[in-house]
């Protein structure tokens, strides 16, 4: 696999002596480059109009940020691209306050990152009041692949495919964490897959630098990670969480690839009018039902969690139901039943996740974030070393033909389309201040 060379940050530690994270102001510096037409680290920036450089094929999706379109290059530019159009933070006849914090953060990080398993940013375009990020195009995402295996009847994703997907996902995550970037929103819809079977981490709108932040991560964004993939420490109100939240999400994604449905599918409690973050009681209950109760012996800092009294109340009200302590057989039963339901072969071998898959899943879904596997350690797990190294093409040897991403032809005017949705929650991020940082390298 061809890799770009450059300077690499030291891996995360308590106080690395010579690390120079991409923090503080290379982020606004990168964004400022977009406004002045200067090149960024990995992509270029321009004031030219989108339609001068790209032919819009159709509309893909919309979200809190704005809209995503599929495009083809023109005027000498070849290939297919995804163009994300950010809506202004507030736009109307009387006021215009710019673009959202998450948009600025994503632009800044995307222009500094370069790894085969992270979506590549081609360029940033400023046009009138809108910002456009042009990405390489991926024909699939994990959510689409999971849905395909559920229709018209349940058909398991091949074990080799799952292993390759996880291996590539973890390689991308190692790179992000080595460079002090926490993704904070890993889920199947944000994991892209190209037609060549290359897995790429996308959507860095909630990503955050975690090396000596100027304020707690909680104060910047009070709600992170989609509810079904949210780690226990986040559910329990941790103010100072770590990249381990991304590994819990990887465990949830692994389980979903196996079972074709979310393993912890809770109902999200919404914030009240005062923007108070509620205890996600139902989601925590879904976790405890399978994983058993977290214990102070296994998780020494459990009682220090802000929402620990709420957890105690939840457990006290369901004492018989949650009788198993962590380390019980709840996850074992779930895993073994999943393999039976989806007709994976019994015994060891490359065609089944096997006992190694269960061992990896347990270490990813560890309650205590300090004991949870890191991305680097996960790559060394015997699940990936038994029966040969995973392929860099998750579709290799697969006879399954996945449908390409659906593109709407009825809404392909990138200039005038309305931009529904609201910005992600969170306060201004003061980690976007300071001196320029050095360019990240691919790891």
Curated annotation (Swiss-Prot):
Cofactors that this protein relies on: Mg(2+)
Annotated catalysed reactions: L-seryl-[protein] + ATP = O-phospho-L-seryl-[protein] + ADP + H(+); L-threonyl-[protein] + ATP = O-phospho-L-threonyl-[protein] + ADP + H(+); [DNA-directed RNA polymerase] + ATP = phospho-[DNA-directed RNA polymerase] + ADP + H(+)
Localization of this protein: Nucleus
Keywords linked to the UniProt accession: Activator, ATP-binding, Kinase, Magnesium, Metal-binding, Nucleotide-binding, Nucleus, Repressor, Serine/threonine-protein kinase, Transcription, Transcription regulation, Transferase
Keyword ATP-binding recorded: yes
SUPFAM superfamilies to which the protein is assigned, alphabetical: Protein kinase-like (PK-like)
Superkingdom to which the source organism belongs: Eukaryota
One of the record's GO molecular function terms: protein serine kinase activity
EC number: 2.7.11.22, 2.7.11.23
Residues noted as binding ATP in the record, renumbered to the chain: 60-68, 84
Chief place of localization: nucleus
Ranges for region Disordered: 1-24, 405-443
Active-site residues, record numbering mapped to chain: 185 (proton acceptor)
Complex formation: Component of the srb8-11 complex, a regulatory module of the Mediator complex.
Family according to the record: Belongs to the protein kinase superfamily. CMGC Ser/Thr protein kinase family. CDC2/CDKX subfamily.
Protein known as: Serine/threonine-protein kinase SSN3
Native organism: Phaeosphaeria nodorum (strain SN15 / ATCC MYA-4574 / FGSC 10173)
